[in-house]
Every structure is written in structure tokens, then in C-alpha cells.
């Protein structure tokens, strides 16, 4: 233990280093990292001698965040590229537990940033979620608390703890720590090398397996892994399994109405349903709405599986009701997908998947509406309406209110949805005017040959 403490306190010095960019004995394949900075820009770097970067051309943003006089640490939850659904669920739950712990105790004085570890080349399944913790005081208590946190994680997956510091030449390095048999040991050290930003955000290849599920079975597999610790997951699965997989829309029109919170969506959907003598359905449906708060408190992969399966339950209801009358749906698949994309893709608008990317395509096994309307209002109008509602906010409602970049990513994702796309409706005018506009769009859509 004394040896571990000496390593923990000791400076990074010459004898510790091997060939360029890596400590002796630590020749792991280079991985890349993307760090979301406070201004929503992204900084990419790699570790190791063979990393395809340029150590002689440092990124000043990395030097400011990882170098002295403050102290920075990385904490990543490992997931192998070939990991199954159960492993991804366990990793997501550990990531969320770590997030809660990093907001308490000695960590409260630290700056917490979003960090993603990934394999180069756009390989699906290789993204690892994590954090960068920036201690402004370089307090040994922070390091000790992190090592204790690492030691408390006895079950797989165990997080990887890295510590950043600069050598006498000003080059950045990362030490990697593990806790083995109660001993805290340094197990690796590699140079931090800036690398170019890849053409596609590295989390995008993982979206279909983690949050934007391409079909019913993919979402179902996630909740199946949750039944041992979320009893309500079994109830949701039982309801989904009662819904036929092969369904068809009836002869009457089906219109889905989408929009951010406080765009007047609830009022418009009810008014349109009354005007058309239509059945009004909501996603998630009432049969699982009682469990919404439970799943909203879970990691994104579980939360999105819940909402995705809710869409399939709604689809079954649509098929039944559209045989008898028109159907208006308050939110549907587009809502589930857009919030997931905006949440998972770090950075700004420019980092979203490009237009026409497959992630924006409607699932082939989910019943499609005839028309999708997207209600929009100005940010100022939406904020004013939110403040007047006085209702408890979901995590995403609070994020929309506090984070303009997140709101813009949600709106852009809505606009990039295809097959079917969204018809944008300005919901800023009076309720009567908005209702008239919506009814006119519906009438024109169904009167076209």
C-alpha cells in the first residue's frame, strides 16, 4: 500500500517513461476520446505512442483543461464492441450511479464534463461513456475519493480511472489506476496526443443499439434485461407481447402531432380531435403511463426502450381505432428518436448525424401515420409558457429550459426526420388561428390525389 501511495503522490519523471507517448510496459492499443467543453465544442485526443496524432502540435484547449495548475481525472465505463444487451444495460446503470456520486461530497467543488471513449474507424458498439473531473484545488482528497470509488466497484464492468498531468517539458500524460486486492496501483501511463475530429460523431454508430432502436425486438431485449431490478419492466413487456406484430392501419386518417414541451401540443391535439370527431391517443399510452416516472429516472438506454415499446402499444391502438374513425396521436416515434439523438450526441448542432442518415428513418415494423405535424414557437414564447405551467418537469423538460443548444438539437433532429417527415406549423398565434392552420393542412393533405 505504501508503494501505491508513493506512486499516487509522485511526480511524472523520466525513468517512468518508455518510448514516445507510453510508459514502459503499457502498450495497450490507442483509443480515442472526445471531450465536451463548456461552450459545447468538442476536443478529440488519443493515448499512446501509436496514436495518429501530433504531440508537437498541442491543442491549447486540452492543455487548459488537463494540465496544471489544476488537476483532472477521467472515469470511463468499459464496454467491448461485441458486448450484448445485458452488458450495455449494466454499463449504463454504472455510469448513472457514478454521475450521482460525482455530484456529492468532495467532488462538488470540481467541474464535471462529459467524456466519451471510442475506437477509431466508426466501429459500432465501441463507445464508452465517462466523465472528466476537473479539481480547481488539486486536493489529494479528490484523488483519494476517486480511488475509493473505484475500489467500491467490485462487479463488472469496473470503471477505468485516469489521472492527467504534465511532464517538465509541458507534454500531457495520463496515468491509469486500478484497485487490486485492496491495493491501489498504477497500471499504465500514456501520452495525450490531439487527433482530428472524425467525419461522424463517434456515438452515432451506437445509436441503434442504445437509444434509437430500429425495431420492436431491439427495444424489447433491453427491458428484458431489466426485469430483475425493475418489476414494472415485466408488466410493460407483457402488454407489448399482447400487441400483434403484423398490423394495418384502418381506412380513416391518422395524424401525429409533435412538438417541444409548451408549444401548445396538448391543446391543439384535443381541439383537432374534437373538430374531426377523432379518437385521441397519446404516447406513451395510459396503460403504461403510470410507470413513466420510474423509467424517466433510469439511464437513457432503459428510458428509451420504455418509450419505444410504448410506441408499439400505441400502434396497436391506432390500428384498431382507425378502422372506425380518424385518429390523432399526441407524440409518436419522432419524439422518442429526436430526444434520444439530442441527448446522446454531445456538442452542438454541427455534430448531429447528417441529413438523410439512417437514424432519421422510421422503423419498418412500426405503423406509420398518414401525416405528422410539428408545432414550433419561439424560444422566448416557449419559456414564457413553461414558466406559467407550474408543473413538475421531466429531466428532458428541465434540459430544454436550461440548455438552448439541446433545444436546437431536438428541433433540428425533428426537421431531419424522414419517411415520413414533419410538416412544420407555427404555433405562436392564437389557439383559434393555430387550430385553423392545422385543420387546413389535414384537409389539404387528404384531399390530394
From Swiss-Prot:
GO BP terms: cellular response to lipopolysaccharide; dTDP biosynthetic process; dTTP biosynthetic process; dUDP biosynthetic process
Subcellular location: Mitochondrion
InterPro entries: P-loop_NTPase (IPR027417), Thymidylate_kin-like_dom (IPR039430), UMP-CMP_kinase_2 (IPR014505)
Keyword Coiled coil appears in the UniProt entry: yes
Transit peptide: 1-98
Gene3D superfamilies: P-loop containing nucleotide triphosphate hydrolases (3.40.50.300)
Positions annotated to bind ATP: 259-266
SUPFAM superfamilies, per database record: P-loop containing nucleoside triphosphate hydrolases (SSF52540)
Keywords carried by this UniProt record: ATP-binding, Coiled coil, Kinase, Mitochondrion, Nucleotide-binding, Pyrimidine biosynthesis, Transferase, Transit peptide
Positions in coiled-coil regions: 380-412
GO cellular component: cytoplasm; mitochondrion; nucleoplasm
Presence of the UniProt keyword Kinase in the record: yes
Catalytic reactions on record: CMP + ATP = CDP + ADP; dCMP + ATP = dCDP + ADP; a 2'-deoxyribonucleoside 5'-diphosphate + ATP = a 2'-deoxyribonucleoside 5'-triphosphate + ADP; a ribonucleoside 5'-diphosphate + ATP = a ribonucleoside 5'-triphosphate + ADP
Sample GO molecular function, one term: UMP kinase activity
Enzyme Commission numbers on file: 2.7.4.14, 2.7.4.6
Induction remark: By interferon-alpha. IRF1 is crucial for the transcriptional activation of CMPK2.
Tissue specificity remark: High levels are observed in myeloid, lymphoid and mesenchymal tissues.
Family of the protein in this entry: Belongs to the thymidylate kinase family.
Annotated disorder: Basal ganglia calcification, idiopathic, 10, autosomal recessive: A form of basal ganglia calcification, a genetically heterogeneous condition characterized by symmetric calcification in the basal ganglia and other brain regions. Affected individuals can either be asymptomatic or show a wide spectrum of neuropsychiatric symptoms, including parkinsonism, dystonia, tremor, ataxia, dementia, psychosis, seizures, and chronic headache. Serum levels of calcium, phosphate, alkaline phosphatase and parathyroid hormone are normal.
Function summary: Mitochondrial nucleotide monophosphate kinase needed for salvage dNTP synthesis that mediates immunomodulatory and antiviral activities through IFN-dependent and IFN-independent pathways. Restricts the replication of multiple viruses including flaviviruses or coronaviruses. Together with viperin/RSAD2 and ddhCTP, suppresses the replication of several coronaviruses through inhibition of the viral RNA-dependent RNA polymerase activities. Concerning flaviviruses, restricts RNA translation when localized to the mitochondria independently of its kinase activity.
Name of the protein this chain belongs to: UMP-CMP kinase 2, mitochondrial
Amino acid at each position: 500500500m505504501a508503494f501505491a501511495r508513493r506512486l499516487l503522490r509522485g511526480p511524472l519523471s523520466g525513468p517512468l517513461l518508455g518510448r514516445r507517448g507510453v510508459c514502459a510496459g503499457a502498450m495497450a492499443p490507442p483509443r480515442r476520446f472526445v471531450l465536451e467543453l463548456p461552450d459545447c465544442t468538442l476536443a478529440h485526443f488519443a493515448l499512446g505512442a501509436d496514436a495518429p496524432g501530433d504531440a508537437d502540435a498541442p491543442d491549447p484547449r486540452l492543455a487548459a483543461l488537463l494540465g496544471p495548475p489544476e488537476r483532472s481525472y477521467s472515469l470511463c465505463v468499459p464496454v467491448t464492441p461485441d458486448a450484448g444487451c445485458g452488458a450495455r444495460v449494466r454499463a449504463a446503470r454504472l455510469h448513472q450511479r457514478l454521475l450521482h456520486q460525482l455530484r456529492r461530497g468532495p467532488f462538488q467543488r470540481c467541474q464535471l464534463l462529459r467524456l466519451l471513449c471510442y475506437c477509431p474507424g466508426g466501429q459500432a458498439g465501441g463507445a464508452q461513456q465517462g466523465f472528466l473531473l476537473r479539481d480547481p484545488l488539486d486536493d489529494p482528497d479528490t484523488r483519494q475519493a476517486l480511488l475509493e470509488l473505484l475500489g467500491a466497484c467490485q462487479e463488472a464492468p469496473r470503471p477505468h480511472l485516469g489521472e492527467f498531468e504534465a511532464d517538465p517539458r509541458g507534454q500531457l500524460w495520463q496515468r491509469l489506476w486500478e484497485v487490486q486486492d485492496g491495493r491501489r496501483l498504477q497500471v499504465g501511463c500514456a501520452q495525450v496526443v490531439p487527433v482530428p475530429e472524425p467525419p461522424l460523431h463517434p456515438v452515432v454508430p451506437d445509436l441503434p443499439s442504445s437509444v434509437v432502436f430500429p425495431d420492436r425486438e431491439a427495444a424489447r431485449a433491453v427491458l428484458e434485461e431489466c426485469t430483475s431490478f425493475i418489476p414494472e419492466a415485466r408488466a410493460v413487456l407483457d402488454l407489448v407481447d399482447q400487441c400483434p406484430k403484423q398490423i394495418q392501419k384502418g381506412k380513416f386518417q391518422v395524424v401525429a402531432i409533435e412538438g417541444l414541451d409548451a408549444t401548445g401540443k396538448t391543446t391543439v391535439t384535443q381541439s383537432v380531435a374534437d373538430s374531426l370527431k377523432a379518437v385521441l391517443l397519446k404516447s406513451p399510452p395510459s396503460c403504461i403511463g403510470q410507470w413513466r416516472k420510474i423509467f424517466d429516472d433510469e439511464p437513457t438506454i432503459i428510458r428509451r426502450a420504455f418509450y419505444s415499446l410504448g410506441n408499439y402499444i400505441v400502434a396497436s391502438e391506432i390500428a384498431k381505432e382507425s378502422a372506425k374513425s380518424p385518429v390523432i396521436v399526441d407524440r409518436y416515434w419522432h419524439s422518442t428518436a429526436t430526444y434520444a439523438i439530442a441527448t446522446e450526441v454531445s456538442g452542438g448542432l454541427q455534430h448531429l448525424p447528417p441529413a438523410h442518415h439512417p437514424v432519421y428513418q422510421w422503423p419498418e415494423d412500426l405503423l406509420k401515420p398518414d401525416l405528422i405535424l410539428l408545432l414550433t414557437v419561439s424560444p422566448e414564447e416557449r419559456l414564457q409558457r413553461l414558466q406559467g405551467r407550474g408543473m413538475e418537469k421531466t429531466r428532458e423538460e428541465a434540459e430544454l429550459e436550461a440548455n438552448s443548444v439541446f433545444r436546437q438539437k431536438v428541433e433540428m433532429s425533428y426537421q431531419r426526420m424522414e419517411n415520413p417527415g414533419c410538416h412544420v406549423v407555427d404555433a405562436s398565434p392564437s389557439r383559434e388561428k393555430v387550430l385553423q392552420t392545422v385543420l387546413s393542412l389535414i384537409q389539404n393533405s387528404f384531399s390530394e390525389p
